[in-house]
Amino acid sequence: MPDAIMSRIAILGCTLVLVGGWPAAKAQEPPIMLVPHRAIYDLTLGQARDNAQVASVRGRILYDFDGNACEGYTLQFRQVSELDSGEGKVSTSDLRSNTWEDADARRFKFTSENFLDQNLIDTVDGNAEHRASATAINLEKPEHKSLDIGATVVFPTQQMVRVIAAARAGGNILDFPVFDGSDTGDKVYDTLTVIGRKLATDDRKHDDAAAGVAKLDGVPRWPVKISYFEKTGERKNTEQTPVYAIGFELYENGISRALSLDYNDFVVSGKLSSLEIKDVKPCP
């Protein structure tokens, strides 16, 4: 699997990061509170399109979120995938990342390592901060670099909060740029989010780890698809092909199930195989 594509899988972990005490979509609604949780998703090949040189995919994604409104929120993420071309060639990718975001979504720290067949091919280490007129990015790896990006760019936690707030309010389309520290650590992606109709809360006959979890009883959820595009500054063509797209069922508390990772040539399905909902740590 191409390295750039594998690194895009990290966006899922970033978008599910824990947050507490964010503004609600409407004044009368309670604040958006995403629960800390540890989730494992088993990956398989869902669909191979005509030009895909992929016979099978298997792998696993691990997410571990923690933190509180005083210390900020951390995400430990690891994704291992094995791709078989069907011609005797099997490649294994191992992507590991750690992020921290403060409770105000103003500062963001990120590190990642990407291994291909046990060889380290990419390392990223940096931080970003929202300022008055721009967002400043400072990189230590892969090279020392500083740059400013647009002030309207959002970090992963804020991205997911906006999605949930829009879903609560009955919205179905969101369009804004996102910076998550993936790839080379200096790229901004335009995103297009499509939110479907709220699913029935009593329709939970799942065959995955979400089934029978009492803490999910009565929690609203929506089908969501987020597409990521190269940022050109003038994305007007609705036919532009996204670099990557992810679909999932999103609970109001931030837990996701039924993943669909679309890389254009092929689609990977992610089944929630393990879920641990943690207690929220109080501020000291």
Region spans (language model):
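Bacterial N-terminal signal peptides that target proteins for export
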Residues: 2-12
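Bacterial N-terminal signal peptides
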Residues: 11-21
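N-terminal cleavable signal peptides for secretion/export
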Residues: 25-72, 76-87
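A short, structured loop/turn motif at beta-sheet edges
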Residues: 29-35, 64-73, 100-106, 216-219, ...
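Beta-strand elements of well-folded, non-transmembrane domains
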Residues: 43-47, 63-69, 81-85, 99-103, ...
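Hydrophobic/aromatic beta-strand elements that line small-molecule binding cavities or substrate pockets
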Residues: 59-66, 94-101, 126-128, 246-249
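Hydrophobic/aromatic-rich structural module bridging two neighboring secondary-structure elements via a short loop
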Residues: 77-131
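Mature, soluble, non-transmembrane domains
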Residues: 111-284
